[in-house]
UniProtKB/Swiss-Prot annotation:
InterPro entries: HtpX_protease, Pept_M48_protease_HtpX, Peptidase_M48. It comes from the Bacteria. This is Protease HtpX homolog. It comes from Methylibium petroleiphilum (strain ATCC BAA-1232 / LMG 22953 / PM1). Its main location: membrane. It is a multi-pass membrane protein. One of its GO terms (biological process) is proteolysis. CDD domains: M48B_HtpX_like. One of its GO terms (cellular component) is plasma membrane. The keyword Transit peptide does not apply.
Length: 283
Protein backbone atom coordinates (compact mmCIF):
# COMPACT_ATOMS: atom_id res chain seq x y z
CA UNK A 1 0.00 0.00 0.00
CA UNK A 2 2.83 2.41 0.87
CA UNK A 3 4.50 1.90 -2.51
CA UNK A 4 1.16 2.48 -4.25
CA UNK A 5 0.96 5.81 -2.43
CA UNK A 6 4.53 6.64 -3.51
CA UNK A 7 3.60 5.85 -7.11
CA UNK A 8 0.57 8.15 -6.92
CA UNK A 9 2.68 10.95 -5.40
CA UNK A 10 5.31 10.47 -8.12
CA UNK A 11 2.73 10.70 -10.90
CA UNK A 12 1.15 13.79 -9.32
CA UNK A 13 4.53 15.53 -8.93
CA UNK A 14 5.54 14.84 -12.51
CA UNK A 15 2.12 15.94 -13.78
CA UNK A 16 2.63 19.25 -11.95
CA UNK A 17 6.02 19.65 -13.65
CA UNK A 18 4.44 19.00 -17.03
CA UNK A 19 1.82 21.67 -16.34
CA UNK A 20 4.46 24.20 -15.26
CA UNK A 21 6.39 23.66 -18.48
CA UNK A 22 3.15 23.87 -20.46
CA UNK A 23 2.40 27.21 -18.84
CA UNK A 24 5.76 28.58 -19.97
CA UNK A 25 5.24 27.24 -23.48
CA UNK A 26 1.67 28.42 -23.97
CA UNK A 27 0.09 30.03 -20.93
CA UNK A 28 -3.22 28.58 -19.72
CA UNK A 29 -3.82 26.77 -22.99
CA UNK A 30 -0.34 25.24 -22.81
CA UNK A 31 -1.00 24.18 -19.23
CA UNK A 32 -4.23 22.43 -20.26
CA UNK A 33 -2.48 20.66 -23.14
CA UNK A 34 0.36 19.64 -20.81
CA UNK A 35 -2.18 18.16 -18.37
CA UNK A 36 -3.65 16.00 -21.13
CA UNK A 37 -0.16 14.96 -22.25
CA UNK A 38 0.85 14.14 -18.67
CA UNK A 39 -2.23 11.99 -18.10
CA UNK A 40 -1.49 10.17 -21.35
CA UNK A 41 2.14 9.69 -20.33
CA UNK A 42 1.10 8.34 -16.93
CA UNK A 43 -1.13 5.77 -18.65
CA UNK A 44 1.59 4.88 -21.15
CA UNK A 45 4.24 4.62 -18.43
CA UNK A 46 2.12 2.26 -16.34
CA UNK A 47 1.52 -0.18 -19.19
CA UNK A 48 4.55 0.16 -21.46
CA UNK A 49 7.51 1.79 -19.66
CA UNK A 50 9.13 -1.58 -18.88
CA UNK A 51 9.14 -2.56 -22.56
CA UNK A 52 10.47 0.88 -23.45
CA UNK A 53 13.40 0.62 -21.03
CA UNK A 54 14.29 -2.91 -22.15
CA UNK A 55 14.29 -1.69 -25.75
CA UNK A 56 16.57 1.26 -24.84
CA UNK A 57 19.12 -1.28 -23.61
CA UNK A 58 18.55 -3.69 -26.51
CA UNK A 59 17.93 -6.38 -23.90
CA UNK A 60 17.46 -9.91 -25.26
CA UNK A 61 15.19 -12.36 -23.46
CA UNK A 62 16.81 -15.66 -22.48
CA UNK A 63 15.44 -18.94 -21.14
CA UNK A 64 16.58 -22.24 -19.68
CA UNK A 65 17.97 -23.42 -23.01
CA UNK A 66 19.85 -20.25 -24.06
CA UNK A 67 21.28 -19.30 -20.63
CA UNK A 68 20.73 -22.34 -18.39
CA UNK A 69 23.00 -21.39 -15.47
CA UNK A 70 21.88 -17.77 -15.22
CA UNK A 71 18.20 -18.57 -15.79
CA UNK A 72 18.34 -21.38 -13.25
CA UNK A 73 19.90 -19.04 -10.68
CA UNK A 74 17.08 -16.51 -11.11
CA UNK A 75 14.47 -19.29 -10.91
CA UNK A 76 15.95 -20.63 -7.66
CA UNK A 77 16.12 -17.17 -6.07
CA UNK A 78 12.58 -16.30 -7.19
CA UNK A 79 11.33 -19.49 -5.54
CA UNK A 80 13.17 -18.59 -2.31
CA UNK A 81 11.60 -15.13 -2.41
CA UNK A 82 8.16 -16.67 -3.09
CA UNK A 83 7.83 -14.66 -6.31
CA UNK A 84 6.47 -15.61 -9.73
CA UNK A 85 9.25 -16.37 -12.20
CA UNK A 86 10.18 -13.07 -13.92
CA UNK A 87 11.27 -12.76 -17.52
CA UNK A 88 15.05 -12.82 -17.77
CA UNK A 89 17.10 -10.61 -20.10
CA UNK A 90 20.74 -10.17 -21.05
CA UNK A 91 22.26 -6.90 -22.27
CA UNK A 92 25.33 -7.08 -24.49
CA UNK A 93 27.43 -4.51 -22.60
CA UNK A 94 30.88 -4.89 -21.03
CA UNK A 95 30.03 -2.67 -18.05
CA UNK A 96 28.80 -4.81 -15.13
CA UNK A 97 25.30 -3.83 -14.01
CA UNK A 98 21.75 -5.11 -13.56
CA UNK A 99 18.20 -3.86 -13.05
CA UNK A 100 14.60 -4.96 -12.58
CA UNK A 101 11.51 -3.56 -14.25
CA UNK A 102 7.78 -4.22 -14.68
CA UNK A 103 4.36 -3.21 -13.33
CA UNK A 104 4.18 -5.75 -10.52
CA UNK A 105 5.61 -9.14 -9.47
CA UNK A 106 3.31 -10.90 -11.93
CA UNK A 107 4.70 -8.82 -14.83
CA UNK A 108 8.33 -8.41 -13.81
CA UNK A 109 11.62 -8.72 -15.64
CA UNK A 110 15.23 -8.78 -14.49
CA UNK A 111 18.12 -7.84 -16.75
CA UNK A 112 21.88 -8.14 -16.41
CA UNK A 113 24.76 -7.17 -18.66
CA UNK A 114 27.04 -9.78 -20.16
CA UNK A 115 29.83 -7.90 -18.40
CA UNK A 116 28.45 -8.64 -14.94
CA UNK A 117 28.28 -12.35 -15.74
CA UNK A 118 31.97 -12.27 -16.67
CA UNK A 119 33.41 -10.32 -13.73
CA UNK A 120 31.41 -11.64 -10.77
CA UNK A 121 31.71 -15.01 -9.12
CA UNK A 122 28.60 -17.19 -8.99
CA UNK A 123 28.14 -16.30 -5.33
CA UNK A 124 28.39 -12.55 -6.05
CA UNK A 125 26.01 -12.81 -9.01
CA UNK A 126 23.46 -14.56 -6.79
CA UNK A 127 23.69 -11.60 -4.43
CA UNK A 128 23.07 -9.12 -7.25
CA UNK A 129 20.10 -10.98 -8.69
CA UNK A 130 18.63 -11.42 -5.20
CA UNK A 131 18.90 -7.62 -4.83
CA UNK A 132 16.93 -7.16 -8.06
CA UNK A 133 14.29 -9.64 -6.96
CA UNK A 134 14.01 -7.72 -3.68
CA UNK A 135 13.03 -4.68 -5.77
CA UNK A 136 10.33 -6.86 -7.36
CA UNK A 137 9.16 -8.14 -3.97
CA UNK A 138 9.02 -4.59 -2.55
CA UNK A 139 7.14 -3.40 -5.67
CA UNK A 140 9.78 -0.76 -6.38
CA UNK A 141 9.97 -1.63 -10.05
CA UNK A 142 6.90 0.32 -11.20
CA UNK A 143 8.09 3.46 -9.40
CA UNK A 144 11.60 3.32 -10.83
CA UNK A 145 10.47 2.55 -14.37
CA UNK A 146 7.82 5.28 -14.44
CA UNK A 147 10.22 7.86 -13.01
CA UNK A 148 12.83 6.95 -15.64
CA UNK A 149 10.50 7.36 -18.62
CA UNK A 150 8.79 10.47 -17.25
CA UNK A 151 12.11 12.15 -16.39
CA UNK A 152 13.15 11.71 -20.00
CA UNK A 153 9.90 13.28 -21.18
CA UNK A 154 10.36 16.23 -18.82
CA UNK A 155 13.85 16.88 -20.18
CA UNK A 156 12.46 16.82 -23.72
CA UNK A 157 9.69 19.30 -22.87
CA UNK A 158 12.17 21.55 -21.09
CA UNK A 159 14.26 21.69 -24.25
CA UNK A 160 11.14 22.66 -26.20
CA UNK A 161 10.63 25.50 -23.74
CA UNK A 162 14.12 26.76 -24.48
CA UNK A 163 14.32 26.34 -28.24
CA UNK A 164 10.75 27.04 -29.31
CA UNK A 165 9.83 29.70 -26.79
CA UNK A 166 6.12 29.98 -26.11
CA UNK A 167 3.33 32.36 -25.25
CA UNK A 168 2.06 33.64 -21.98
CA UNK A 169 -1.54 33.73 -20.86
CA UNK A 170 -2.10 37.06 -22.70
CA UNK A 171 -0.98 35.57 -26.02
CA UNK A 172 2.31 37.47 -26.10
CA UNK A 173 5.65 35.70 -26.49
CA UNK A 174 6.76 34.20 -23.22
CA UNK A 175 9.70 35.60 -21.30
CA UNK A 176 12.82 33.91 -22.74
CA UNK A 177 14.44 34.01 -19.31
CA UNK A 178 11.55 31.92 -17.98
CA UNK A 179 12.17 29.43 -20.77
CA UNK A 180 15.84 29.18 -19.83
CA UNK A 181 14.95 28.68 -16.17
CA UNK A 182 12.48 25.93 -17.06
CA UNK A 183 15.08 24.24 -19.24
CA UNK A 184 17.54 24.24 -16.33
CA UNK A 185 15.24 23.60 -13.39
CA UNK A 186 12.74 21.07 -14.77
CA UNK A 187 15.29 18.28 -15.31
CA UNK A 188 16.79 19.15 -11.91
CA UNK A 189 13.37 18.82 -10.29
CA UNK A 190 12.86 15.48 -12.03
CA UNK A 191 16.25 14.32 -10.70
CA UNK A 192 15.32 15.38 -7.16
CA UNK A 193 12.09 13.38 -7.41
CA UNK A 194 14.10 10.36 -8.54
CA UNK A 195 16.59 10.84 -5.69
CA UNK A 196 13.81 11.03 -3.13
CA UNK A 197 12.46 7.62 -4.11
CA UNK A 198 15.68 5.88 -5.15
CA UNK A 199 18.26 6.09 -2.37
CA UNK A 200 16.14 4.65 0.42
CA UNK A 201 14.88 1.78 -1.71
CA UNK A 202 18.45 0.77 -2.64
CA UNK A 203 19.22 0.18 1.04
CA UNK A 204 15.99 -1.78 1.41
CA UNK A 205 16.76 -3.88 -1.67
CA UNK A 206 20.28 -4.57 -0.35
CA UNK A 207 18.80 -5.80 2.91
CA UNK A 208 16.05 -7.77 1.17
CA UNK A 209 18.47 -9.27 -1.33
CA UNK A 210 20.81 -10.38 1.45
CA UNK A 211 17.87 -12.08 3.16
CA UNK A 212 16.81 -13.83 -0.06
CA UNK A 213 20.32 -15.09 -0.88
CA UNK A 214 21.32 -15.62 2.74
CA UNK A 215 24.72 -14.11 1.89
CA UNK A 216 25.10 -10.37 2.63
CA UNK A 217 28.89 -10.60 2.29
CA UNK A 218 28.60 -11.76 -1.34
CA UNK A 219 26.44 -8.77 -2.26
CA UNK A 220 28.85 -6.42 -0.49
CA UNK A 221 31.74 -7.91 -2.46
CA UNK A 222 29.75 -7.62 -5.70
CA UNK A 223 29.00 -3.94 -5.11
CA UNK A 224 32.67 -3.16 -4.54
CA UNK A 225 33.69 -5.05 -7.67
CA UNK A 226 30.97 -3.44 -9.83
CA UNK A 227 32.05 0.01 -8.66
CA UNK A 228 35.68 -0.65 -9.58
CA UNK A 229 34.78 -1.79 -13.07
CA UNK A 230 32.12 0.91 -13.59
CA UNK A 231 34.74 3.63 -13.15
CA UNK A 232 36.59 2.47 -16.25
CA UNK A 233 33.91 0.86 -18.43
CA UNK A 234 30.95 3.08 -19.41
CA UNK A 235 27.49 1.57 -19.82
CA UNK A 236 26.77 2.99 -23.26
CA UNK A 237 22.97 2.69 -23.10
CA UNK A 238 22.86 4.51 -19.75
CA UNK A 239 25.05 7.31 -21.14
CA UNK A 240 22.50 7.72 -23.96
CA UNK A 241 19.55 7.51 -21.55
CA UNK A 242 20.78 8.93 -18.21
CA UNK A 243 17.23 9.09 -16.83
CA UNK A 244 17.36 5.27 -16.51
CA UNK A 245 20.51 5.26 -14.35
CA UNK A 246 18.52 5.13 -11.10
CA UNK A 247 17.17 1.69 -12.08
CA UNK A 248 20.61 0.08 -11.93
CA UNK A 249 22.15 -1.65 -8.95
CA UNK A 250 25.10 0.76 -9.29
CA UNK A 251 25.16 4.26 -10.79
CA UNK A 252 26.48 3.61 -14.33
CA UNK A 253 27.10 7.22 -15.35
CA UNK A 254 30.64 8.44 -15.83
CA UNK A 255 31.94 11.81 -14.70
CA UNK A 256 31.26 14.01 -11.70
CA UNK A 257 29.69 17.45 -11.47
CA UNK A 258 25.92 17.51 -11.22
CA UNK A 259 25.72 13.83 -12.09
CA UNK A 260 27.71 13.00 -8.98
CA UNK A 261 26.05 15.61 -6.78
CA UNK A 262 22.56 14.41 -7.68
CA UNK A 263 23.33 10.70 -7.73
CA UNK A 264 20.28 8.48 -7.27
CA UNK A 265 22.38 5.85 -5.47
CA UNK A 266 23.77 5.92 -1.93
CA UNK A 267 27.53 5.75 -1.45
CA UNK A 268 28.84 2.25 -2.08
CA UNK A 269 30.86 2.40 1.15
CA UNK A 270 27.68 3.01 3.15
CA UNK A 271 25.85 0.18 1.40
CA UNK A 272 28.73 -2.21 2.03
CA UNK A 273 28.92 -1.22 5.71
CA UNK A 274 25.21 -1.92 6.20
CA UNK A 275 25.53 -5.30 4.48
CA UNK A 276 28.60 -6.31 6.48
CA UNK A 277 26.69 -5.47 9.66
CA UNK A 278 24.29 -8.26 8.67
CA UNK A 279 27.07 -10.88 8.50
CA UNK A 280 26.85 -13.21 11.52
CA UNK A 281 29.79 -12.67 13.85
CA UNK A 282 31.89 -15.69 14.73
CA UNK A 283 32.25 -16.32 18.44
Amino acid sequence: MFNLMKTAVLMAAITALFMAIGSVLGGQQGMAIALVVALGMNFFSYWFSDKMVLKMYNAQEVDASSAPQFYGMVRELAAKAELPMPKVYLINEDAPNAFATGRNPQNAAVAATTGILRVLSERELRGVMAHELAHVKHRDILISTISATMAGAISMLANFAMFFGGRGSDGRPANPIAGILVMLLAPLAASLIQMAISRAREFEADRGGAEISGDPQALASALQKIQRYAQGIPLEAAERHPETAQMMIMNPLSGGGLRGLFSTHPATEERVAKLMAMVPQRV
